[in-house]
Amino acid sequence: LHRFARLDALVNNASSFFPTPLAAIDQAAWDDLIGSNLKAPLFLTQAAAPYLKAAHGAVVNITDIHAERPLAGFPLYCAAKAGLLGLTRALAIELAPEVRVNAVAPGPILWPEDASFDPSARDHIIEHTLLKRSGSPQDIARTVHFLLNDAPYVTGQVINVDGGRTAHL
């Protein structure tokens, strides 16, 4: 803000992702997953709102297809992303007409680099994705770019970028 004196866009992309079987959920997991996936986007948007309104800007939240179709073993992550999906729609109402608020819901794009996601589960997901492959971070970036720059009459929407995964679930 100091350098350009305006804010045109906010992309809430920070996220934590790890399994939380019901019996293993604790306060630390709650704080991490809810904090990064729901709390941070809310308060960042709140802080940015006056500047975004002045610039007639846009917000894009990165949700997940599992916000609406939960992934077994990840109830806290799914709940946090479902909250972000609801927040996206609520903020579209709150910030209109000056600010557009949308979301992108990635499907199988990136996989954890540790052993927290079973390779056979990953293969099963890809098999049940219409395009039979993972997407790339560039697929998400292009969709975010579209929402920020080429969609002036779109707000309160979620675009699934999932290779057809949700059409096949």
Which functions belong to the PLM regions below?
Residues 21-22, 29-34, 114, 121, ...:
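Substrate-binding pocket helix/loop in short-chain dehydrogenase/reductase
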Residues 45, 80, 88:
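Active-site helix of classical SDR
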Residues 96-100, 155-156:
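Short, small/polar-rich loop/turn modules that mediate ligand/substrate recognition or access, typified
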Residues 50, 93-97:
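Alpha-helical segment proximal to the catalytic Tyr-Lys
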Residues 25, 70-78, 90:
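Active-site loop-to-helix junction immediately N-terminal to the catalytic Tyr of the SDR YXXXK motif
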Residues 69, 128, 145, 149-169:
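Short C-terminal tail/terminal secondary-structure segment
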